[in-house]
Amino acid sequence: MNIILASASPRRKEILENTNVRFDIIKNEIDEIILEGETPKHLVMRLAFEKSMSVASEHNEDVVIGADTVVVLDNAILGKPKDESCARDMLKRLSGREHQVITGISLINLCEDKKVIDYVISNVKFKTLSEQDIEDYLKTNESFDKAGAYGIQGYGALLVEEIRGDYFNIVGLPISRLGDLLKKYFSINLFYGV
């Protein structure tokens, strides 16, 4: 049984590489749309499941991991900004405020008929940002492929006042919860590998 990460995210790859488990990466191909009335928790769990299922259908003997992360402020989902103006607006909205980062994770092994879906929530409080802080951060080009227009593992850490919860969840893969689920449902220990 192999592990496959159904993600093109370099951050998720790096987090999983810090364990002793061997894995392959296969990029998933799904449309990340929000369904009408869908809550952020349901959205990330559904998208994580769709990502893992899109790969598991052709790799049914493997454990396929899917993940999806969103930033939530005032019950509004902040996805990846489409352009610099959108990123600027997101950072202004986040300035001085606390928001949630929610990551859905899905583990599927079709051969054993196992499907596990979960989510993790972390809270992040931003410093009060000046216009110059926002412009300086935008110049780093970190905003454009990240939910909420920032990456805490890079220069985005300079925007953050406080976090509560799993740091790796904020980066995009809650490795502690993932390790618990792999051990409980698939007898895979991230300390030792498969």
Swiss-Prot record:
GO cellular component, one term: cytoplasm
Keyword Translocase listed: no
Cofactor: a divalent metal cation
Keyword Repressor: no
Gene Ontology annotations of biological process type: nucleotide metabolic process
Sample GO molecular function, one term: dTTP diphosphatase activity
Keyword annotations of the record: Cytoplasm, Hydrolase, Nucleotide metabolism
Site positions per UniProt: Important for substrate specificity: R11, T69, Q153
Active site residues of this protein: D68 (proton acceptor)
Subcellular location: Cytoplasm
CDD domains membership: Maf (cd00555)
Reactions accelerated catalytically: dTTP + H2O = dTMP + diphosphate + H(+); UTP + H2O = UMP + diphosphate + H(+)
E.C. code: 3.6.1.9
PANTHER family given in the database record: BIFUNCTIONAL DTTP/UTP PYROPHOSPHATASE/METHYLTRANSFERASE PROTEIN-RELATED, BIFUNCTIONAL DTTP_UTP PYROPHOSPHATASE_METHYLTRANSFERASE PROTEIN-RELATED
Record-stated family: Belongs to the Maf family. YhdE subfamily.
Described purpose of this protein according to its UniProt entry: Nucleoside triphosphate pyrophosphatase that hydrolyzes dTTP and UTP. May have a dual role in cell division arrest and in preventing the incorporation of modified nucleotides into cellular nucleic acids.
Name of this chain's protein: dTTP/UTP pyrophosphatase
